[in-house]
Amino acid sequence: MADESGKKIELTIGDDILHFTVGLAAYNNCLNAMTESNKVAPSFNFAMSTVHPDDKETLTKWLDQGLATDIAGHLMTEFRPKVQITVKA
């Protein structure tokens, strides 16, 4: 179930509107679980753990079409703050 204290994110996938609540713990858990040869399962779990319960069945329809990494990528991009980081040498 989605962490109610996180950032609310709405994704439109095809004609479906899905609602997610992404918190820092879910974001970090997904990144920490990813390896060079294991990206799909953490992406799937991240999406399923952050989606609103009412949208879970619809999300499963899209995840079953191989979109786990795409959906997780959009959620992660939207969750992160938009900042410019520069390095001074």
What are these regions (language model features)?
Residues 2-6, 14-16, 21-89:
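Short, surface-exposed, charged amphipathic helix/loop patches that serve as local interaction elements
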